[in-house]
UniProtKB/Swiss-Prot annotation:
A motif (RDXXRA motif of the pArg binding pocket involved in allosteric regulation) lies at residues 337-342. Appears to be allosterically activated by the binding of pArg-containing polypeptides to the pArg-binding pocket localized in the C-terminal domain of McsB. ATP binds at residues 27-31, 92, 125, 176-180, 207-212. GO terms for biological process: phosphocreatine biosynthetic process. Its EC number is 2.7.14.1. GO terms for cellular component: extracellular space. The lineage of its organism: Bacteria, Bacillati, Bacillota, Bacilli, Bacillales. This is Protein-arginine kinase. Residues 24-254 form the Phosphagen kinase C-terminal domain. The gene is mcsB. It holds the Pfam family ATP-gua_Ptrans. GO terms for molecular function: ATP binding; creatine kinase activity; protein kinase activity.
């Protein structure tokens, strides 16, 4: 399969589409945790109860269509190959926990903006993932899916506590709202160490690209709410919206300051990273993330011309181990992965430049 066709098939909407403020906000995510009323939580339920949840979703929702979202398809974790599960995780469509659940499943929309995880930490986890800064659109879609499911499922709900969940931190609205942000300006100007504690004071948490316990590779940070009880869904989304909007403003100011005060140094950093990506024959994940962040910053500041700004979103995912092995058609040793990663990046950059040259020639 050619890289062009592989990318077309592999990319989710949030990776290839542009959204509001997408130079800084890569994606907006809403996740709702829900449970069946008369079935024990996943930590305590029987195999029969777990199977019945999957079966109910297959009967009522798989193959069905929801307006503005499209048709859903059920993927059972027990039927998916380890590599397929890893790719779904790398695309942020399922969690690492779900890949290990013997009775896990995922109901996925056609454009992959909506994924409904089954038998993870909770019976149901509705996720809506949109490109750019679109928390309001994401919560609207999540509520639409939630109402659709509730037509067939009686949720565990208490008048005082709200939606009941396996983890006490999710009780209440069951809502986790998050934005994935590219913040190289704030990192390079050494402001993130000051900003993160301030964000934590507001009841929000800052994590890496793959959530809890992950490192902020490539200057990509995930900011989400911590509290779900005692606040309405609207308040949670509004609070995160407000903090994200301030971060966007601060990041833009930091980038402008860098460009004005350290232009040569910044250009040198950007073009060195571009040179590495364009010419390397082996490259590890960590160096890839650093170089992609530099190049994306260069694109956004107009230092590098002729490259799509979505290249960071694409290559941060396509160069993960699961995708590399899927593209190569089998398992790879670490050094083989590093070589395959370098080849994929070089070919992707070449495709981009060739497409832009053709556009210029046709004008």
């Amino acid at each position: 399969m050619s890289l062009k066709h592989f990318i077309q098939d592999a990319l989710s909407n949030w990776m290839k589409q542009k959204g509001p403020e997408s130079d800084i906000v890569l994606s907006s995510r809403i996740r709702l945790a829900r449970n069946f009323e008369n079935i024990k939580f996943p930590a305590r339920y029987t195999n029969e109860e777990a199977s019945s949840i999957i079966q109910q979703f297959e009967d009522h929702f798989s193959g069905k269509e929801l307006p503005d979202i499209g048709q859903f398809h059920l993927i059972r974790m027990s039927e998916a190959q380890p590599l397929e599960k890893r790719v779904l995780m790398e695309k942020h469509l399922i969690s690492p926990n779900l890949t290990e659940s013997p009775f896990g499943g995922c109901l996925l929309s056609e454009n992959e903006e909506v994924s409904i995880m089954l038998n993870e930490e909770d019976h149901i986890r509705i996720q809506c993932l949109f490109p750019g800064f679109q928390l309001l659109n994401a919560i609207k879609a999540a509520n639409q899916v939630d109402d659709w499911i509730e037509e067939k499922v009686d949720y565990a709900f208490g008048e005082k506590r709200g939606y009941l969940t396996s983890c006490p931190t999710n009780v209440g609205t069951g809502l986790r709202a998050s934005v994935m942000m590219h913040l190289p300006g704030l990192v390079l100007t050494r402001q993130m160490n000051r900003i993160i504690p301030a964000i934590n004071q507001l009841g929000l948490v800052v994590r890496g690209i793959y959530g809890e316990g992950s490192e902020a590779l490539g200057n990509i940070f995930q900011i989400s709410n911590q509290i779900t009880l005692g606040k309405s869904e609207q308040d949670i989304v509004d609070d995160l919206n407000s903090v994200a909007a301030q971060l966007i403003e601060q990041e833009r100011s930091a980038r402008e300051a860098l460009y004005q005060t350290s232009k040569i140094e910044l250009e040198d950093r950007v073009f060195r990273s571009y040179g590495v990506l364009s010419n390397c024959r082996m490259i590890e994940s960590k160096e890839t993330a650093k170089c992609l962040s530099d190049v994306r910053l260069g694109i956004d500041l107009g230092i590098i011309k002729g490259l799509s700004s979505n290249i960071l979103n694409e290559l941060m995912i396509l160069t993960q181990p699961g995708f590399l092995q899927q593209y190569s058609g089998g398992a790879l040793r670490p050094n083989e992965r590093d070589a395959r990663r370098a080849a994929l990046i070089r070919e992707r950059l070449h495709l981009e430049m060739s497409a832009n040259r053709q556009e210029d020639d046709s004008i």
